[in-house]
């Protein structure tokens, strides 16, 4: 049994807080029960609430992000199916995707004193931090890679935590929000 299961991770969520995710600047659900009914007009955010909870409960798994965007057909236009980039900007409130953009989902259960928390943030890409730069330059035999703009990108960082458990990953994202499969 994992530490998260022992701490009540598998337990039902009682409260969910969503910040800057899709259509929500800030949204909270309280007093959730075993069965909950989300009611609202078309395009009011019902599916977005379920998606936020899904990403939270996926413990930051990169596949959950890809599956979510795939189910909505959120990919960069003009991309071939075999080389498709997923358009991550749709996950951010107002499609705002720039350095400092961030969304988060937090959940609390009755059985645990710990909060489950997911944060997805965008920062400036620092190519010096990425060791593959030299290898890529040699492989492509490019003398002036900056002139070609190959490294104009953002860093996307995903952090998930629950008590002492932590999971994180990062990936390069194009300036337009294109995410290749992590």
Which residue ranges define each predicted feature?
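Pre-Walker A-like glycine/lysine-rich segment at the N-terminus of P-loop NTPase domains
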Residues: 2-58, 67-75
């Amino acid at each position: 049994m994992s530490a998260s299961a022992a701490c009540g991770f598998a337990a039902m969520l009682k409260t969910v807080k969503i910040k800057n995710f899709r259509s929500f600047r800030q949204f909270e659900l309280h007093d959730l029960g075993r069965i909950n009914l989300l009611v609202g007009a078309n395009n009011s955010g019902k599916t977005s609430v379920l998606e936020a909870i899904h990403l939270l409960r996926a413990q930051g798994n990169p596949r959950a992000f890809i599956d979510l965007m795939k189910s909505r057909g959120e990919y960069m236009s003009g991309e071939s199916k075999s080389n498709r980039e997923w358009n991550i900007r749709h996950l951010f409130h107002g499609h705002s995707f720039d350095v400092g953009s961030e969304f988060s989902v937090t959940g609390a259960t009755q059985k645990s004193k710990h909060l489950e928390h997911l944060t997805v943030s965008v920062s400036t890409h620092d190519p010096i931090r990425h060791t593959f730069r030299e290898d890529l330059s040699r492989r492509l035999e490019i003398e002036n890679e900056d002139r070609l703009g190959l490294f104009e990108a953002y860093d996307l960082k995903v952090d998930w935590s629950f008590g002492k458990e932590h999971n994180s990953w990062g990936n390069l994202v194009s300036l337009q929000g294109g995410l290749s499969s992590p």
